[in-house]
Amino acid sequence: MLQYLFGGDRMYEFFKEQLDSKVKNHNLRTLREYCPIDAVRVKRDDKEYLMMASNNYLGLTFEPRVIDGALKGTKQYGTGSGGSRLVSGTFPLFTELEKELAKFKNTEKALVFNTGYMANVGTISAIADKNTIIFSDALNHASIIDGCRLSRGTVKTYSHCDIDELKYLLKQVDRNTRKLIVTDGVFSMDGDIAPLDKLYELSRDYNALLMVDDAHATGTIGNGHGTAAYFGLEKEVDIQLGTLSKSLGSVGGYVAANSTIIDYLVNTSRSFIFSTALSPADIGAALAALHVLETDASVLARLQENVNYMADQLISMGIDATNETPIFPILIGRNEDTLAVSDYLYEAGIIGTAIRPPTVPIGESRIRLTVTAAHNKEQIDYVCQSLQNAMKQL
């Protein structure tokens, strides 16, 4: 039946040719199974590995207080939500989490989505339409790019963090045209921080909405509240988006904004309206993790101490590591060389994933290393020494 629907063997041959091309270009992706031991160690084929590739920045996935939050949510409300938020899936836990997120982000309201990807896609496609011009950073996350496409608005992509180019593009547009400037707060593959203060000035000068995706900024930079807080712009940024799945150790996404925007999304965002709500365990874990972040300063302090320590070690090796975030891109270049470094680290008991196109531009393949609050200095030393040894093999 499938062969009939897709044009018989010829269509399957097309798929096979595409996969063969990826193999030839050292760009084939496969799934690799890991069994977590704790926040930084995993097991595979009876061998233990040090995880240096996850976004579990605060190490909260094994935090007893967060696990307890998930268990309490399940015991009180069951294993699943059973419906979409607008039908039957809005439990008291959701309301509590959204109030806490709004308070955390210093906004009037917040709205929880099932993933950060769905939050970006659902928000951008709702607030922008064919009459909107969207100004998007060249290195924005794929979910922002897809949201822009779904909106059917005109997209103007500016070079990465290039304020002068963005200003030039804004000047070409009538002031009364609907405009949206959207950026990652911390860029997921480079680890640098968007110049949000300058973006805000342009949004004000050219009458544009400003949206920031804080997926990798929440729980990592400044006081942990995200990029807007880092720049002192919590009240000025129109839309703050984030995830529950990275620093907060659960799963899900959210949007924080004023009441008008949130109420509008409830009524227009398709990825919100037509999705079954997250499970009570997910929401309970996120609530508990948010409480840990807000009340236990030692967790964020440990992360930032480890970030500084790892940056110092990499700089001593001649690697540029001047950012303030837990993301350390080790630029290699060619796919095959990047895979070779990743394989060397793997043999040394370290998970350091090779990031290749289309996730990053052609010729900019890299090892993306991340450090968390749960790593210790001995582990960081071992990773840096192993990386140095791996680079010598190229």
Tell me what each language-model feature is.
Residues 68, 72-115:
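Conserved N-terminal alpha-helix of the aminotransferase class I/II PLP-enzyme fold
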Residues 281-301, 315-317:
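Amphipathic alpha-helix from the class-I
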Residues 2-17, 24-77, 208:
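N-terminal "arm"/small-domain region of PLP-dependent enzymes with the aminotransferase-like
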Residues 4, 8, 64, 68, ...:
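PLP-dependent enzyme catalytic core of the Aspartate aminotransferase-like
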Residues 229-264:
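Active-site PLP attachment segment
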